[in-house]
Each structure stands twice: as C-alpha cells, then as structure tokens.
C-alpha cells in the first residue's frame, strides 16, 4: 500500500489539473499557433509558466485504485498487475481468464 501522503498529493494534482485545464489549453493553443505573432506566442508561454506546476497534466501519475502502486498499472483496469492477477484468478474481472494453449 502506498503512503497516504502520496495518494493525497495525487488527488491534489487531479484537482489542480481540472481547475486550470481551460486556461492551460488556451495558452497552449496560442503558444503553438504559428499564425500569431511571436510576441503573442511568447506571452502565452510566460502565462503557462505562471500556472502552478501541478496544474500540468503531465505531472499526474497513474496509480492502482486498490493499492496506490505507481508502477505496473494497466490503464484499462486502473489496477496494478499484481491485483489484476489476483482478481482474475478469483474470477472477479469479467472476460479475463488464465491463458492456456
């Protein structure tokens, strides 16, 4: 189980990303728009830098919903590989069976 502080930090990042998503998208679009002047694009980059660091979606980390494990997490299930294995063997994940050939 991951430390509670790490899980809370991730939740805080999720909230910040949601809060600043619109501004971040607007500034990013302006900064990448080559039809705009260089001054406008530079200003948009400066505004992006003024946003909180944790408002950037790339700082989010996928974690297991059960254990909070940051690595080996499958996006499709939102679970770590070890938990997927346990739940699959128990028959709790529909459509997942042990491979045999």
UniProtKB/Swiss-Prot annotation:
GO terms for biological process: translation. Keywords: Ribonucleoprotein, Ribosomal protein, RNA-binding, rRNA-binding. Disulfide bonds: none annotated. GO terms for molecular function: rRNA binding; structural constituent of ribosome. Part of the 30S ribosomal subunit. Contacts proteins S3 and S10. Binds 16S rRNA, required for the assembly of 30S particles and may also be responsible for determining the conformation of the 16S rRNA at the A site. Belongs to the universal ribosomal protein uS14 family. This is Small ribosomal subunit protein uS14. It comes from Polaromonas naphthalenivorans (strain CJ2). The gene is rpsN.
């Amino acid at each position: 189980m991951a430390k509670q502080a790490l899980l809370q930090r991730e939740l805080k990042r999720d909230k910040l990303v949601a809060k600043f998503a619109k501004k971040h998208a607007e500034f990013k679009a302006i900064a990448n728009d080559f039809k705009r002047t260089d001054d406008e694009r530079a200003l948009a980059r400066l505004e992006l830098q003024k946003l909180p660091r944790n408002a950037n979606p790339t700082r989010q980390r996928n974690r297991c919903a059960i254990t909070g494990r940051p690595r080996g997490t499958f996006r499709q299930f939102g679970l770590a590989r070890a938990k997927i294995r346990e739940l699959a063997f128990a028959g709790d994940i529909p459509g997942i069976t042990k491979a045999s050939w």
